A protein has these predicted regions:
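Active-site-adjacent structural elements that line small-molecule/cofactor binding pockets in enzymes
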Residues: 1-181
Length: 181
């Protein structure tokens, strides 16, 4: 909420379950419970962001009447975007408590993920088009045909990474990205 206020409502809250068993163990988290823990944390955050006084009772988190201030500038809360592949379990969570999905471009079965997300939305009576779909390319930028295909599939934004290079190397890459877009 504080970051949303400081940014004038420009915050997008990216979330994911995590994948590294060792890292989770080092942080005292049970890898097998990560999905349920994330779900409850997001539902809890929404309660605190949208109510003057909130309580929560879940399998992993419980608390009685509490409050949190400041409240987000964005109403009812900053957009919550789930990263990663969208198998049936992740798709169900995207449909339940997220505002969007942001897979890594070229790394997952995008079409299958889109179908899973649409099916999960339909199963709970949510319009799949209410989700903001973005694709993140961590290594460069896709070609113009791929970007067009994404747009035709309902993708609203493609994010192209720019490697940490000096201006003489980075600027030509940006020129190429611009041609693709």
């Amino acid at each position: 909420a504080s970051l949303d206020m400081l940014s004038g409502g420009r915050l997008e809250f990216g979330i994911g379950y995590g994948w590294c068993v060792e890292e989770m163990r080092n942080h005292g988290l049970d890898y097998k419970k990560r999905r349920g823990i994330l779900r409850e944390n997001i539902l809890l955050a929404k309660e605190l962001w949208t109510k003057d006084e909130a309580s929560f009772s879940g399998k992993h988190i419980q608390f009685e009447s509490s409050w949190a201030w400041p409240k987000p500038t964005t109403k009812p809360h900053p957009p919550i975007l789930m990263g990663g592949a969208a198998g049936p379990k992740t798709a169900a969570h995207i449909a339940e408590f997220c505002d969007g999905w942001m897979p890594l471009g070229g790394m997952y079965d995008f079409e299958g993920g889109m179908k899973n997300v649409a099916d999960a939305c339909n199963a709970i009576g949510r319009d799949p088009s209410s989700l903001q779909i973005s694709v993140f390319y961590g290594m460069g930028c896709p070609d113009a045909d791929t970007i067009k295909k994404h747009a035709d599939q309902g993708v609203k934004r493609v994010i192209c990474a720019l490697p940490p290079q000096p201006a003489d190397a980075a600027l030509p890459m940006l020129d190429q990205y611009a041609k693709n877009i």
